[in-house]
Amino acid sequence: MKKILFFLIIFLSSCSTTERFLPGFTPDFITKYFKEEVKPYVGLPDFVKNTDVIKVWEKKLPGEINNEYSFLSMYKLGDRIFIPTDENNIHIVSSETGELKKTIDTGLDVFSGIIADSDLLYFGSKQDTITAIKQSDHKVIWQRLMSSEVMSISEVANDVIYVVTNDSKITAIDINTGKFLWINSQIPSSLSIRGSSKPIISDDKVYVGFEDGRIVSYDSLSGDIIWQNQLKSIRIETVIDRLNDIDGAMIIDNGILYAISYQGSLAAIDSFNGQVLWINEVSSIDGLAENDDNIFFLSDEGILKGVDKYTGKQKWKQDQFFKRLIGTPVYYNDFILVSDIE
């Protein structure tokens, strides 16, 4: 303690001495230390509360969902919520009461997924595996080593899941045996934002968004490419400018595929032939939400926007929460729910 105090006295004395020779001079690290922090987002705006929010339940679980170095997220199926943590566990909680139904020790570093059906649970690990575990007795039914990290897993469709890996491959896997049914690949981009949108299945086709803004429609049975289209980058001056990942959730509604890319576009595409119906230059790393007539998304500036599904015309925007809003919006009962950075 004496050494520290002595250092401070000498330091302050030195500053005082410097002031005599250089009037008005104060070292930068002194001014910056006492300078009020400037936040990169606006303050919370004033608003009139006209909706009551009631907490139904709260549950404290061991571990945490740490998605800084993974793509962990909760998954809901029926009245169950599957919660992966950084302690290799997956907790199953009642969505009605918050009661902990069971905890499954996977023995692996859960990295991505989680997908579940009535019987099995599927997830990707940091060990580059995809695993199917029986929910009733926690038994591993099958496990396959993939060519790279598992970035996303589709919902189960006709006893098949479709897995996207970090090397831009998509693999169809039989959920009963773990057998690879087919594998198809794209040329990986030289630079990308680490992430991947979840494959979606509709009418015997699988739709996947890749890191170069490319959307590919595959035949779900054979893996053959039916069509592909690319959402162009807004800017192309540098490699960073050309980042154009499709990492957020895509939507299919009435035969139209809606997708959005980072530094690229929001587009409506005919899911049958890949024809672009309309396109807007926007940028978002998050996914889309919808109701009957509109598409909702959050721009990179944290501005919530609503556009017409059929024309692509912007109907409204909410910019009072500039850079505060994060994540994919959720449409529920004529409300749009969005996370705040604080």
Locate each region found by the language model.
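Sec-dependent N-terminal signal peptides
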Residues: 4-12
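Extracytoplasmic beta-rich repeat domains
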Residues: 19-28, 50-75, 100-117, 140-157, ...
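Short loop/turn segments that connect beta-strands within beta-propeller blades
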Residues: 94-97, 134-138, 174-178, 220-223, ...
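Structural signature of WD-repeat beta-propellers
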Residues: 85-86, 125-126, 165-166, 210-211, ...
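Blade/loop signatures of beta-propeller domains
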Residues: 30-59, 225
